[in-house]
Amino acid sequence: MQNLSSLDVKGKRVLVRVDYNVPVKDGVVQDDTRVTASLPTVNALLGAGASVVLMSHFGRPKGGPEDKYSLRPVAPVLEKVLGRPVKFIASLPGSDETLQAVQELQPGEVALLENVRFEAGEEKNNPELNQKLARLGDAFVLDAFGSAHRAHSSVSGVAAQLPHAAGTLLQTEVEALGRLIEAPESPYVVIIGGAKVSDKIKVIENLLPKVDRMLIGGGMMFTFIKARGGVIGNSLVEDDQVDYARGLLEQFGDKLMLPTDAVAADRFAADADTRVVPADQIPEGWMGLDIGPDTQQAYTEALRGAKTVFWNGPMGVFEFPAFAAGTNAVAAAVGSLKNQAYTVVGGGDSVSAINKSGKADQIDHISTGGGASLELLEGKALPGVEAMR
């Protein structure tokens, strides 16, 4: 991929696709992680004498302006973390008004465009919109790894029209995740959780031949346990994936590690009655909502001595304190490998879990891209990444 140093930006206007799809409540940004993640690229461009025009999507508007999806609340947050004024441009990104506003920018100045999904052609990679957006810069930088798997106008469409390069964040993500696929150091342990096997099929398939152990947790564990003939009560199961899970167990049984015990609940609620039971003997009318203490210990042991670790997906319904112990145990175990193993955490829920556990600073790489991380690990070519080559 071309990096920032390949662009001559002095005195030029650089259009940067960032990922500012942040949680906003009552017009206030709740978490500025994605905003601060863009600073290395923005500061590098400003330092090289450019003016910077930032472009992002936010939420899922229906191809037109909607107040609740405006990026306006992000501007003051960006000003604060950047330490300089940010000009918010409220007109549609592809409009002549926006073009006029960005043409007035001086080197060292920063503008934030309105939500690019307010343009109906954005998600269709519309050629006319691609050209309108390309007018806004002399060069284009893609730094939105979280959107790199989308062939949209603001991701790959504009790239074809302008000199382009990958931003610091995009580069870091692709290199960090690449290490999990290309010659990972052994022992290589992957922890996969979350509700559904169907969401993770391709990742599981692509990684299983490369790993030494794959630890399964979360709701998906019961599809595997049922495939082994276990009794799962009212636990979450994907019946249409049971045969598939059985096939994986037959082919990779020596690598796949399943929970031996589970925290079962009499209903799906924070204050449900709970008991620890064998994972393949969930009582009738009960449901497994977390891995049990024996499994927590076994998974912690399985991680000891690992040289490469990837974790995606929680071990249980960690939003409820009664079912968070499994996820917290994995967070602690992965965090304890600092300086011994190369550790990567990806996927929204596992990132929240690692942040909640206070272990985030002990992880080598925390991925900002949910779907994009998984698609890269599935072995897919991402349109945004390909456009930067």
Curated annotation (Swiss-Prot):
The keyword Transport does not apply. It is found in: Cytoplasm. Keywords: ATP-binding, Cytoplasm, Glycolysis, Kinase, Nucleotide-binding, Transferase. GO terms for molecular function: ADP binding; ATP binding; phosphoglycerate kinase activity. It catalyses: (2R)-3-phosphoglycerate + ATP = (2R)-3-phospho-glyceroyl phosphate + ADP. Substrate binds at D19, Y20, N21, R34, H57, F58, G59, R60, R117, R150. InterPro entries: Phosphoglycerate_kinase, Phosphoglycerate_kinase_CS, Phosphoglycerate_kinase_N, Phosphoglycerate_kinase_sf. GO terms for biological process: gluconeogenesis; glycolytic process. Belongs to the phosphoglycerate kinase family. This is Phosphoglycerate kinase. It comes from Deinococcus deserti (strain DSM 17065 / CIP 109153 / LMG 22923 / VCD115). The gene is pgk.
